[in-house]
Regions:
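Cofactor-binding beta-sheet edge motifs in enzyme active sites
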Residues: 1-135, 142, 150-508
Length: 508
């Protein structure tokens, strides 16, 4: 067992980027030249965050077709990276910085520069607006009371400099995960057999919510059965964990619902024989109705048309899920008594391919935006984040607490890498000196401001209920740095510690 001081996850190695942009006097980007030198760790590391950047990055979300990207990778022998990239996600904030530079040079709002350059839903030649992006911008400006100003021109009452910044991203769904779903009906309840999460993506409850929604029963009527031998697990790359597995589970739930209603219609015409001590079979109010004339409800929707006959074998009042006649909800029977047999439904598959995986930025559906306000004390170099705001459109929010936690997590990353986290190297040997979690400074819960959130639901995605999810797409490397630039007019290499701020200001 390692102590906190002995343990260290190097996570992401260093990367140096030199980007050149050409743009018109209106701010439209006409040329992009990106050269990177990246540390791959050791030979055999994943190219997820290095070579993959050449196919997916922020540049393809713009109307610019004149793009050149080059990368050299060195191996510093720091460790093997099985999946993590250099930036999270990728090199997105090169464009974020570029948009702020253009806005400052032209004395224009950075949001207006972003809107001018963003292409439409279908291609880089598409001049239409992206509805999801427009919805996020409208709500974001209102949330933050957005009022852009030129760098270094706004001073707060306490004498500190005010700065603000903006960033957009795609809400990605990775679309490389397939699922083998199974549902069982037993005694009026729905059972979901699963081995549970295996990579920290705890989407089981989200799947249960989808099942309850599709079958129109209460969440408590869906029983999750955990066992290592069950095949289904709702994992997947990034946001696939919930949205893609939810799509597959939705298909499975509808198969089970069809089976339940068909069995209810069959048993109404062919009632099970009464037991020796159970009395004669009760009259079935669903008799004479076909499966497509029936539906399921979480509870009776009306008083029964005919009161149950009195006597020792009279059925108790129905309180749980029921099968009812769609044309007359007063005709119903409890789900448990309407279907006596055990039923099983299975589905194997995945949702349609996501735009993220098909176009890598060249097609757009669901998007997100984030905003930052800072106060910079130019006398001592201290930076305070005044506000962090996120307006995201995941298509459809499946479970609000999960979405909120996803946002809080990535904004924690955001603040940490831009204000606290720093590698310290020995000048003579090049060795990293702070290889532990005490000397590598991460923010604590006392350091991170409350993130103001507003979620849009345009249903623009193509996973369950039009969702795409969020993944780590809001994690960024330069949102705070851009706000510091807007406050002071100087660029600070992250992390923006007081000494670095003062050095950038020319005071030390």
């Amino acid at each position: 067992t390692q102590t906190r001081e002995e343990s260290f996850d190097f996570l992401m190695n260093q990367r140096f980027i030199h980007m050149k942009l050409g743009f018109t006097k209106e701010g439209l980007i006409t040329a992009i030249d990106d050269f990177s030198i990246a540390d791959g760790g050791v030979q055999g590391s994943s190219g997820f965050g290095t070579a993959n950047d050449q196919g997916y990055g922020p540049y393809y979300t713009t109307k610019c077709l004149n793009i050149r990207q080059r990368m050299e990778i060195i191996d510093s022998n720091t460790g093997k990276m099985y999946l993590s990239g250099q930036f999270c996600p990728f090199n997105w904030d090169t464009l974020t910085v570029g948009l702020h530079i253009i806005a400052e040079k032209l004395n224009k709002d950075v949001i207006d520069i972003a809107k001018l350059n963003l292409h439409g839903p279908d291609s880089q030649e598409d001049d239409r607006v992206v509805p999801s992006f427009e919805a996020c911008i409208e709500a974001g400006k209102k949330l933050m009371n957005w009022n852009w100003h030129k760098a270094g021109t706004k001073t707060l009452p306490d004498g500190r400099k005010h700065g603000a910044s903006f960033r957009y991203q795609i809400c990605p769904r990775h679309a490389f995960s397939g699922y083998d779903c199974k549902l069982e009906y037993r005694g009026g309840q729905i059972h979901l057999p699963t081995q549970g999460p295996i990579t920290g993506i705890f989407a089981i409850e989200c799947n249960a919510m989808v099942i309850a929604e599709e079958l129109n029963v209460e969440y408590d009527d869906v029983i999750v059965d955990y066992h290592w031998s069950h095949k289904f697990t709702p994992v997947g790359g990034g946001s696939d964990g919930t949205t893609a597995s939810g799509w597959a589970m939705k298909e499975c739930a509808n198969i089970l619902k069809k089976n339940i209603l068909e069995q209810a219609a069959y048993e109404a015409e062919n009632p099970p024989a009464g037991g020796m001590f159970g009395g004669p079979p009760q009259a079935n109010p669903l008799k004479g109705y076909k499966a497509d004339e029936l539906d399921i409800a979480p509870h009776p929707l009306a008083e029964p048309k005919e009161a149950p006959a009195p006597g020792p074998f009279a059925a108790p009042p129905v309180t749980g899920p029921v099968v009812y006649v769609k044309s007359d909800p007063s005709i119903f029977k409890s789900l448990a008594s309407a279907v006596s047999l055990e039923l099983v439904a299975t589905f194997s598959g995945r949702p349609p391919a996501a735009l993220w995986s098909l176009g890598m930025g060249k097609m757009l559906d669901t998007m997100n935006t984030c905003y930052c306000e800072v106060a910079v004390d130019e006398e001592i170099g201290a930076v305070e984040i005044l506000r962090l705001g996120v307006v995201a459109d995941p298509g459809k929010v499946i479970r609000l607490t999960s979405m909120e936690s996803q946002v809080d997590q990535v904004m924690f990353f955001t603040q940490g890498c831009q204000l606290f986290e720093e590698f310290i190297f020995d000048d003579k040997t090049g060795l990293r000196l702070n290889n532990n979690m005490i000397e590598y400074k991460k923010p604590t819960v006392l350091d991170v401001p409350t993130v103001e959130k507003d979620f849009r639901e345009t249903r623009s995605g193509n996973a369950v209920y039009g969702a795409s999810g969020l993944s780590h797409s809001l994690a960024n490397t330069h949102l705070v740095i851009c706000a510091i630039y807007n406050a002071t007019g100087v660029w600070v290499q992250p992390p923006a510690t007081p000494d670095k701020v003062l050095k950038a200001l020319g005071k030390i």
